[in-house]
Amino acid sequence: MAVTKARTFRELMNAPEILVVPSAYDALSAKVIQQAGFPAVHMTGSGTSASMLGLPDLGFTSVSEQAINLKNIVLTVDVPVIMDADAGYGNAMSVWRATREFERVGIVGYHLEDQVNPKRCGHLEGKRLISTEEMTGKIEAAVEAREDEDFTIIARTDARESFGLDEAIRRSREYVAAGADCIFLEAMLDVEEMKRVRDEIDAPLLANMVEGGKTPWLTTKELESIGYNLAIYPLSGWMAAASVLRKLFTELREAGTTQKFWDDMGLKMSFAELFEVFEYSKISELEARFVRDQD
């Protein structure tokens, strides 16, 4: 029997080496991540909200909007894809329905958080949490809904800021008991907190590396030495894209050309190389084989 992508992802997550999963916000960024050699892709919730809606990470995206972006990403890469499922889009039955929809789109897992819906970015102020009991109900609904037992359910808690680290650890243990396969404890403040979480939670751990966020910005080797199993980078791609685009189009408005921008940056990609990101040669070959003129 062939090994599924869900099984492959689980094996990577549980391997001795940390699994580094950059975050895509659309099909193009997912393609680039795969071509850079990473074994999996994470679909960022904040980047999806920004790229699809032009709105901040405050719970604006719906299940259907997430599924559209997911489908485009899953169809364009061959590696396993996981996603940010926010707070589950409602109650436990909303989680049940979302799990079915997302799994059938083709992802191998997601992370689900214990914030009140609509949620807020984990590194912003003003987060409100649901009860432990409500969250464990959501996790149990997700476990029931998944069709492949290897589909990975990552439980995120934002309790560190609201209630302290002790409560965040307590909740994390409850979430593991409810069936979570991995724990994502958001917004830890220093390395000592990260080490304590590793010591006190008997489950794989996800590290959320956010530029300018509250958690220390560590290298993958440093995270691995602490004992983290998985690292995601939800802002990196779309923050870089927004920064570069702003500089590029400011140059165009002020100078009337983009030439100086490319000269300063050093043109790293030719026109031909750009098209090969999308496998132009392969698609052209298929077109030549299959597209025939009508008589």
From Swiss-Prot:
Question: Which terms does the record give in the GO molecular function aspect?
Answer: carboxyvinyl-carboxyphosphonate phosphorylmutase activity; oxo-acid-lyase activity
Q: Which InterPro entries match?
A: CPEP_Pphonmut (IPR012697), ICL/PEPM (IPR039556), Isocitrate_lyase_ph_CS (IPR018523), Pyrv/PenolPyrv_kinase-like_dom (IPR015813), Pyrv_kinase-like_dom_sf (IPR040442)
Give the UniProt record's GO annotations in the biological process aspect.
Answer: antibiotic biosynthetic process
Its EC number is 2.7.8.23
Which effect does the record note for changing residue 70 to A? In strain: ATCC 21705
The top EC class is transferase
* Recorded superkingdom: Bacteria
Q: In which pathway does it act?
A: Secondary metabolite biosynthesis; bialaphos biosynthesis
Q: Which Gene3D superfamilies match?
A: Phosphoenolpyruvate-binding domains (3.20.20.60)
**Keyword Metal-binding among record annotations:** no
PROSITE patterns from the entry? ISOCITRATE_LYASE (PS00161)
List the catalytic activities from the record: 1-carboxyvinyl carboxyphosphonate + H(+) = 3-(hydrohydroxyphosphoryl)pyruvate + CO2
What does the UniProt keyword field contain? Antibiotic biosynthesis, Transferase
Keyword Transferase attributed: yes
Biological role: Catalyzes the formation of an unusual C-P bond that is involved in the biosynthesis of phosphinothricin tripeptide (PTT), also known as bialaphos (BA), a natural-product antibiotic and potent herbicide. Catalyzes the rearrangement of the carboxyphosphono group of CPEP to form the C-P bond of phosphinopyruvate.
Q: Which family does it belong to?
A: Belongs to the isocitrate lyase/PEP mutase superfamily.
Instruction: Please report the name of this protein according to its UniProt entry.
Output: Carboxyvinyl-carboxyphosphonate phosphorylmutase
Q: Which gene encodes it?
A: bcpA
